[in-house]
């Protein structure tokens, strides 16, 4: 069994583990053998010294590890002095003291190997190692150990305060609250919290329920008040409508809510019967023209329609004059006379203005493969809706295109005879392509196929002639080789060619 402790590992193993520590305690799983050197405490928790024949460290056995040992053997753990155990899971603790940091381990699982009796080697305390002692003097490890021990003390005091509060719920809990507020929790000791520490006291629950009820009732009251205020504002902002007494035969139009002044707004004191008859007639855009009607007749239709905008206005600017009207025929006749006078004056002005702005369209057909006569059709757009037909003048063109390529106009059109009314007008030319007359698509397809067939046959003849000449030359060479009694074939031809190349190189 002494061979199990042949290689001491305690110093180097603990150095590497503690050097890279960032939290306490350090949890380790390492199957390494150690010997129970000496017992320090025989009662629970049982403490002893474990050595690797060179150094020893204080250890504490957990209750779970002791129960596992009792299931394995009937021996008590305190009777195993000098026995060899193999560690499984264990925790490394660092305790700050006046002399420095003291390390110890807490064994959670181990396997008993046997060999109770003598102690191997002369082990010393792990703190006597120069390397290990230098590591324990690190301020980082000191701060880490102080923080861990302070958190343990604060957690224990908080547990005592919570237990006393549960035993006396009716007493004043101000002292326990002060203790709770002064405690500084760290993330490392959050695992030590119990369920009782997370429960909210009954007094605090009542306070929270009252605050939530007050907030909800206050919020509902504010919403109802806002809705009532909004309804009151909407009712107060509605404009007041004026009620005016009017006659039975007249329709009154009131603009009491308008921002315009009374002098700028026209009134309509016309007779109701006249307005009803005017409304029965269809508007101009709803009376379609017949096919036989001319543009002159359309102007007559427009002149006969009653337009309210053309009614005579009062010189004072108060709208339509309130003169008496006997019948609708008299009203229509007066309106048509005024309408005709205004149309005549506007027509004379428009003719003078549009004389320089008239434009004529000339449509010219483009030339194709055949020679044919072209005709020029001119149309003049008049602003009043009248159409002027220009004289059609035949134009004879020469040979514009010698081939069937894409036609391009390369000459200017000849002089055109227009009437005296449009002699000074601007001329706009529009060229349109005229389709080719009497063109047979199938005939064109047959000619194209015939040309392709002729070209294919010529290529075929040339290829056959080339093959015949080549074969004749090869046959003549083979016959000559046979006549001379020389070997012939592809291999011998290649050999002969290489010999010719070699002779040529030697000569050069």
Swiss-Prot record:
Superkingdom to which the source organism belongs: Eukaryota
Region spans: Disordered: 159-178, 235-269, 282-358
Any one GO biological process: telomere capping
Feature: compositional bias, Basic and acidic residues: 348-358
Subcellular location: Chromosome, Telomere; Nucleus
Chief location: nucleus
InterPro entries recorded: ACD, TPP1/Est3
GO cellular component terms, semicolon-separated: chromosome, telomeric repeat region; shelterin complex; telomerase holoenzyme complex; telomere cap complex
Comp. bias regions, Polar residues: 327-347
Pfam family for this entry, one: TPP1
Region named pot1-binding: 2-223
Keywords attached to this entry: Chromosome, DNA-binding, Nucleus, Telomere
GO molecular function: telomeric DNA binding
Spans annotated as ccq1/poz1-binding: 379-508
Subunit structure: Interacts with ccq1, pot1 and poz1.
Function comment: Telomeric DNA-binding protein that is required to protect the 3'-end telomeric overhang and involved in telomere length regulation. recruits poz1 and ccq1 to telomeres, regulating telomere length negatively and positively respectively.
Name assigned to this protein: Protection of telomeres protein tpz1
Organism: Schizosaccharomyces pombe (strain 972 / ATCC 24843) (Fission yeast)
Primary gene name: tpz1
